[in-house]
Amino acid sequence: MNCAANTAFANRQVITHQIREGFATVFGRSAEAMGMELVYDVAHNIAKVERYAEGDLVVHRKGATRAFGPGSLELPEIFRLTGQPVICGGSMETGSYLLVGTDRAVRDSFGSTMHGSGRTMSRAQAKRTFRGEQLQRQMKQQGIVVKAVSMSGLAEEAGLAYKNISEVVESVDRAGITKKVAEMRPIGNIKG
């Protein structure tokens, strides 16, 4: 598990580097000069040893991420007053949410919450159902720029291939597992 987690971390670092290099090429300034700093990084789909009232437990999060509340010693000091940031992705069309973990999440779900809205159909089904070119045009009409390596790959990410992000977020907010902080609307997407 540690090897897989390290590989995922390294992969995210490479992607971050490539994005910074792309911006530097386009804007003719270094990433540092533009203030392009990593704000937050977290793993999901991982197992970790964590301490709870029941003892030290291996918590496996599949389709989930950590959502520790304020005061948790598991958190870096910068987040101990607020609770853990939770980035909850929707689709390229609908946007995403920033949430924060709660004490209730620790009590009710071993400090876990979802990390995305979840799919309503498989990638293969989405490719059969949607056309990337049409999706790209629709998103352009909504003011969302999309760049994709392939149109079939883009079709996999159609908004209707995912659950309604607002409804999913509302359910965990009502349950007290996380609290809503901000809703983010897409203006641009890159699909590799």
Task: Name each model feature, range by range.
Residues 1-192:
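Domain-length cofactor-binding catalytic modules of enzymes
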